[in-house]
């Protein structure tokens, strides 16, 4: 196939100025060799609750994990070089603006350089993709993310002040705000302090000043000199799109909300999804690139990745229900343990069968007899998992417009119905 990638940035400006962590298994899935310099010790994560009297929880190391840590720019350039070796062409400085619709089919793209016709458009434009946002309603491709579907994140590296005491734990996730607000992390590296502040509500840089100052005050080894980064980016933290294919169109990565919902990391899922898409296209001997062909890609994704991602998204959807104090109470009462958090971080919770998950949550409910509000919120999760069990069988094995429409309606209505709405909660 003749493949051309259109990118609005220049080659030199590609990639955010920070490091990414993902598991080596994703590279193996895609059949890619791993540069030895990317291999790194597994991160040991500590959760720091609001109440300073509650002991932070440090997760045990996931012995099955094989962590890779690489600068984003290096990762992108490595993947570009592999693509170029395979014959892919890259056009830089040309922004994708909209799809070209030829009847019911996507027949190309409109870019800042003109109209580009093609047989298949692969949408990797990101969380705010102009292609996905313009897809017609009949395709059932959801145009916009909903409330609490996106985290607005500030990430930067600050100087590390020599001589100041460093935290006992290197990688700290700080839960000092209610779930409807967001969270922060602070990672102490050899030569810098890596800071991320995430908020569900959109804001400019001024909105991150207060939480940034709180980190300065709490962690004396964090200096005020910005070394690099300092940009605001949006990360999808939700279930994958119900439908991400149409005639002549397939979405991958953040364009289809393919991230691990409790982390926001999408590199592993994107590598795997790209591989599944390539496999489906190779089976299309007539190069029709229509819904029949591309549904095989979506089906493979949901069966191998997507439904596990949905179960993880259910757990993420509980977070906005919780106040910072409730999180501290859960830690103090040992309702949430290091083992629970380790499973959530590794993704093994998401792969549990619904019946196993419900049993696990019911066990926790017995520990919450003295906390009626928390017990009710956890009970909601039991109901969610039960409802998801009913929805999954509606996923069509073959593409049929009516069947796909019914699937998308059930799927989207379910995830929208379980969202927490603060205004509604205050009026109850």
Regions inferred by a protein language model and the residue ranges of each:
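Active-site flanking residues adjacent to catalytic metal/cofactor-binding acidic residues
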Residues: 6, 122, 253
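Mobile, glycine/GP-rich and aromatic-enriched active-site lid/loop segments adjacent to catalytic centers
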Residues: 57, 176-183, 187-240, 246-247, ...
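Predominantly flavin-linked oxidoreductase catalytic cores and closely associated redox partners
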Residues: 82-222, 257
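N-terminal FAD cofactor-binding segment of flavoenzymes
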Residues: 8-51
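Helix-loop-beta segment of a Rossmann-like dinucleotide-binding subdomain
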Residues: 53-71, 108, 189-199
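C-terminal helical "tail/cap" subdomain of flavin- and related membrane-associated enzymes
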Residues: 282-428
């Amino acid at each position: 196939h003749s493949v051309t990638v259109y990118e609005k940035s220049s080659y030199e400006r590609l990639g955010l100025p920070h490091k990414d962590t993902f598991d080596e298994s994703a590279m193996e899935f895609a059949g890619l060799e791993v540069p030895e310099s990317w291999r790194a010790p597994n991160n040991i994560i500590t959760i720091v609750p609001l109440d300073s009297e509650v002991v932070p929880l440090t997760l045990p190391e996931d012995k099955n994990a094989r962590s890779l840590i690489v600068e984003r720019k290096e990762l992108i350039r490595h993947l570009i070089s592999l693509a170029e070796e395979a014959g892919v062409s890259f056009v830089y400085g040309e922004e994708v603006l909209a799809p070209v619709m030829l009847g019911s089919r996507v027949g190309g793209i409109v870019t800042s350089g003109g109209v580009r016709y093609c047989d298949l458009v692969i949408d990797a434009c990101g969380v705010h993709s102009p292609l996905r946002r313009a897809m017609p309603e009949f395709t059932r491709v959801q145009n916009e993310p909903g409330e609490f579907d996106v985290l607005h994140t500030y990430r930067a590296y600050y100087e590390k002040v020599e001589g100041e005491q460093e935290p006992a734990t290197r990688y700290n996730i700080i839960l000092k705000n209610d779930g409807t607000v967001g969270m922060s992390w602070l990672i102490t590296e050899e030569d810098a302090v890596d800071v991320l502040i995430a908020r569900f509500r959109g804001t400019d840089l001024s909105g991150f000043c207060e939480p940034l100052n709180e980190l300065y005050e709490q962690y004396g080894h964090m200096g005020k000199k910005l070394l690099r980064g300092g940009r605001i980016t949006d990360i999808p933290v939700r279930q994958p799109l119900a439908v991400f294919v149409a005639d002549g169109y397939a979405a991958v990565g953040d364009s289809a909300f393919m991230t691990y919902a409790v982390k926001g990391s999408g590199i592993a899922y994107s590598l795997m999804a790209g591989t599944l898409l390539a496999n489906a296209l190779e089976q299309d001997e007539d190069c029709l690139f229509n819904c029949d062909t591309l549904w095989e890609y979506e089906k493979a994704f949901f069966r191998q990745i997507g439904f596990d991602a949905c179960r993880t998204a259910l757990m993420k959807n509980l977070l906005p229900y919780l106040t910072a104090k409730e999180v501290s109470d859960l830690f103090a009462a040992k309702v949430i343990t290091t083992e629970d958090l380790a499973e959530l971080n590794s993704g093994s919770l998401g792969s549990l069968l619904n019946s196993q998950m419900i049993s696990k949550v019911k066990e926790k409910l017995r520990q919450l007899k003295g906390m009626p509000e928390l017990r009710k919120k956890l009970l909601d999760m039991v109901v969610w998992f039960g409802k998801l069990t009913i929805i999954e069988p509606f996923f069509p094995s073959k593409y049929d417009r009516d069947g796909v429409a019914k699937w998308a309606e059930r799927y989207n209505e379910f995830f929208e119905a379980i969202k927490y709405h603060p205004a509604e909660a205050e009026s109850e």
